[in-house]
Amino acid sequence: MAVGTGTSLALSSLLSLLLFAGMQMYSRQLASTEWLTIQGGLLGSGLFVFSLTAFNNLENLVFGKGFQAKIFPEILLCLLLALFASGLIHRVCVTTCFIFSMVGLYYINKISSTLYQAATPVLTPAKVTGKGKKRN
């Protein structure tokens, strides 16, 4: 069930903060093995998604409904935040965070385009009826 913009802003901001704090609290454990560094990148991409949601909800509250996130500054700022948080854990976490974030961003864009883009009607050329050049 969907919630309002203000509630979504509060929830995504809280989840971003908790995820960042959890990543910092368990940074030694996340950097200890190969699989946990991949998990650290996955957590970083979750931080990217939640911070992007919070940032876009804030813009919708300030600028009005229908304001969409663009690549610069919204997506790049949230991506740099997530990459920085992952970099505090391990350098491999940065790479996996980037890969997981790009996959997540692709699916977010795909879902939002099917939900929010208006269908454009397909224009077919009409057959011209009229006097044409006669051939012998």
From Swiss-Prot:
Pathway: Protein modification; protein glycosylation
Any one GO MF annotation of this record: enzyme activator activity
A Gene Ontology term for the protein's cellular component: oligosaccharyltransferase complex
Cytoplasmic side, ranges: 24-34, 109-136
InterPro entries tied to this protein: KRTCAP2
This protein's record includes keyword Membrane: yes
Pfam families: Keratin_assoc
Motif Prevents secretion from ER, residue range(s) on this chain: 133-136
Role noted for this protein: Subunit of STT3A-containing oligosaccharyl transferase (OST-A) complex that catalyzes the initial transfer of a defined glycan (Glc(3)Man(9)GlcNAc(2) in eukaryotes) from the lipid carrier dolichol-pyrophosphate to an asparagine residue within an Asn-X-Ser/Thr consensus motif in nascent polypeptide chains, the first step in protein N-glycosylation. N-glycosylation occurs cotranslationally and the complex associates with the Sec61 complex at the channel-forming translocon complex that mediates protein translocation across the endoplasmic reticulum (ER).
Membrane-spanning ranges: 6-23, 35-55, 76-108
Full protein name: Dolichyl-diphosphooligosaccharide--protein glycosyltransferase subunit KCP2
UniProt topological domain (Lumenal) ranges: 1-5, 56-75
Taxonomic source organism: Canis lupus familiaris (Dog)
BP term (GO), one: protein N-linked glycosylation via asparagine
Subcellular localization: Endoplasmic reticulum membrane
Domain of life: Eukaryota
Subunit structure and binding partners: Component of STT3A-containing oligosaccharyl transferase (OST-A) complex. STT3A-containing complex assembly occurs through the formation of 3 subcomplexes. Subcomplex 1 contains RPN1 and TMEM258, subcomplex 2 contains the STT3A-specific subunits STT3A, DC2/OSTC, and KCP2 as well as the core subunit OST4, and subcomplex 3 contains RPN2, DAD1, and OST48. The OST-A complex can form stable complexes with the Sec61 complex or with both the Sec61 and TRAP complexes. Interacts with PSEN1 and NCSTN; indicative for an association with the gamma-secretase complex.
Keywords on record: Endoplasmic reticulum, Membrane, Phosphoprotein, Transmembrane, Transmembrane helix
Record family assignment: Belongs to the KRTCAP2 family.
